[in-house]
Amino acid sequence: MNLKQQLNKKPNLQKHLFERGYLITDDDYSGALHDYPFYGNWKEYVFGDYRFYVYQTVSAFFQQIGNRTFFLIGHAYDPYNMEPDENKLLQYIGKAYGTDEYFDRLDELTGLFIFGSVCGNSIDFTVDASGMQYGCYGTVQGKQYISSHMRLIGDLCLLETDDYVKRLVNYKWYHYMMGNYMPGDITCFRELKRIGCNTYVSFDGSGYSVERFYPKKAIKMCQTDAEYNEVIKEAARIMMNNMKLIPMKWQRPAISLTGGIDSNTTFAAANGVYDKYTTFSYISMYRESVDAEKAKQISDKFKVKHVVYQIPEKNEDIADYEIYKAIIEHNDGDIGTYSDSDLRKKITLIKEDVCEVEVKSWISETIRAYAYKYFGRTKFKPDLKPRDYSSLYKIFLGNRKLLKETDKYFAEYIQNTKLKEHLFNYDESDFFVWEMMHGGKCGLDIGVMKGCFDITIPYNNRKLLDLLLRVPLDKRISDRHHLDMKKLMNQELYDMNIRVVNLNETDRRKKVINMYYIINTHLPF
């Protein structure tokens, strides 16, 4: 499908292309803002040598401090200082520029954003704690590009999809194990790299450099019950502060609620401000009906309005299904297809007036030792090799050439971001979940979902995540820490004992995928 031709025929759908995106460049597109791919939906700001093109519904904040302009595109709030105002946060962080406090203050932010500063032709930038605001960057024909969407840069610069990426996304096992995303920090174009969460990218006029600023030091694990209880108490306080701050920023926040532990804990954190929230669920397949039923039961108990969205069962029941599909997959980078049921869900929520912002419970998996859960393991070796990363990433038993190429991209990522030098005593498998599964995949997913509504994630705070990584591994695997947080924040909800387990996480599936991991990491080729 020629997307440009189709959108010319459907001007009412043009607004969904690269929706809620941004582009930072030293090239000038001011005369093209009414053409493809902008279609008159973007605004422009100019600071230093750079032009900031931002989708019309996205907030952009700029603060001048000395000779530097600090910027934040998206949203942020600080649960440690109870500050919801991005301009004040820019001042707070920017004044610490060049000191050790700079990144410490940045670590306190919850939100989805790209943050950085500009001075003349130099620019530096990073993304939120888990990269839920996706970002990629690179030099094309002597011009600098930083964007929320790799295909936006590709469309503007007529870039060609990398040959490795073409072969990867057409590989028969590519869609398994967490869906569509790229290894390491690559994108679909050789010219562009993904902005890795926990790293800071700088351009000095001649080239890019990447600095890892987290972790900074060894983590202090909980050794006693008293230390564990203090961690739970502090984590609960920060989560509840986040849930108090969200209604200060949006008029109609809604928690996407299921019977699972992640959103249950989020809902518990809203205790005391339930009158500020609604909840919603959707049913696109049978197993989701169980989640929706439990979500309604929880909401009714605490007198919170709950809405269930029934997703059509057939593609034909959704007008313009094929063009929506093309837009969504292009926004995602054209790095794989979505299932029909997932597309029907997204399109339905795009068309519904669900909320102003969804309070989403992603990123919780980082602190729930998700690699251990997914593979049914109780132990990973402390020093993972590129082959371990590839084996955690995709199933490659049938294509060793593709596997070796993938190994190479993970090796480059580990080296370029200096991950090994900063691991200290952290569990490396947590960083695969944090920086690959979340930063690499979920950031792209969020970029697509923001076509439905804005999204915020109360777990997405580096200081909070680091705090909960102090919890002993057995408690993280069993979700004891989440249950204890929920009990502390809302005893009544805890006493309801509602827990719907992901039906995909069967013991048989875990055994099979773990056997693959063992075999693939031991084969010498």
Placement of each model-derived feature along the sequence:
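Cysteine-centered catalytic environments shared across enzyme families
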Residues: 1-255, 265-309
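ATP-dependent adenylate-handling active sites, centered on carboxylate activation for C-N bond formation
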Residues: 1-17, 23, 121-124, 132, ...
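Short, surface-exposed acidic
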Residues: 98, 165-166, 491-500
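Structural motif
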Residues: 104, 163-169, 420-431, 477
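Core structural elements
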Residues: 431-444
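Short amphipathic alpha-helical segments embedded in low-complexity Lys/Glu-rich regions
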Residues: 502-504
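Radical SAM enzyme core and accessory elements
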Residues: 521-525
